[in-house]
Amino acid sequence: MTQSLADMRREYTRDGLSEANAPSDPFSLFRQWFDDAVKTERLPVEPNAMTLATVDADGYPHCRILLLKGLDERGFTFFTNYESAKGRQLAANPRAAMTFFWPALERQVRIEGSVEKVTPEESDAYYQVRPLGSRLGAWASPQSRVIADRAELERLLADTERRFADQPPSCPEHWGGYRLLPQRIEFWQGRPSRLHDRLDYRRQDGGWSRERLAP
């Protein structure tokens, strides 16, 4: 390593987050911040990339990077193989957390809540707009299972391509979406001297409460 980890740091000076400028609805603030990220972040950065954390039946946490593919007043939607490790973990414990980090804006959003499957119709609607290779991959890959080597995966894909040579692939039953129904959404804005701004929204009595947290 060319630089000591202890010496790696930066000052956050771009912006602030005040209660006066923050809407009472966290979904409105998330949309504002997401739109800012789309305008500011540049490829190869993906503004809809997020860390998804789940917990298995033994209480061990697991996290990985996914892409947000839907947002409405109900919650935040992502898609995956239901038989994958994350799918099995969500079946055992249907709660999860998401984190979005937009470094160019010095912003982070943390979301916690319960998780439900979206309807088959919603899964199919998204599946049908995916690139053909991704649709075939959803059939070919036994996600999270041990395979012998890369050649085995390529053989599985070739078999799938032959299977659907004369017809478009349909959405597999083992693949689809989840929606995280937020109970808590925290917005973090980097500030100088590590005195960051943190606004914490929580579900309460059919609406949302909002509090400032110490950094």
UniProtKB/Swiss-Prot annotation:
One of its GO terms (biological process) is pyridoxine biosynthetic process. It is an enzyme of class 1 (oxidoreductase). Substrate binds at R9, R10, E11, Y12, K69, Y126, R130, S134, R194, L195, H196. Pathway: Cofactor metabolism; pyridoxal 5'-phosphate salvage; pyridoxal 5'-phosphate from pyridoxamine 5'-phosphate: step 1/1; Cofactor metabolism; pyridoxal 5'-phosphate salvage; pyridoxal 5'-phosphate from pyridoxine 5'-phosphate: step 1/1. It comes from Pseudomonas aeruginosa (strain UCBPP-PA14). GO terms for molecular function: FMN binding; pyridoxamine phosphate oxidase activity. Keywords: Flavoprotein, FMN, Oxidoreductase, Pyridoxine biosynthesis. The gene is pdxH. Belongs to the pyridoxamine 5'-phosphate oxidase family. Homodimer. FMN binds at R64, I65, L66, L67, L68, K69, F79, T80, K86, Q108, Q143, S144, W188, R198. Coiled coil: none annotated. Its cofactor is FMN. It catalyses: pyridoxamine 5'-phosphate + O2 + H2O = pyridoxal 5'-phosphate + H2O2 + NH4(+); pyridoxine 5'-phosphate + O2 = pyridoxal 5'-phosphate + H2O2. HAMAP family: PdxH (MF_01629). NCBIfam families: pdxH, PRK05679.1. This is Pyridoxine/pyridoxamine 5'-phosphate oxidase. The keyword Flavoprotein applies. Binds 1 FMN per subunit. It comes from the Bacteria. Catalyzes the oxidation of either pyridoxine 5'-phosphate (PNP) or pyridoxamine 5'-phosphate (PMP) into pyridoxal 5'-phosphate (PLP).
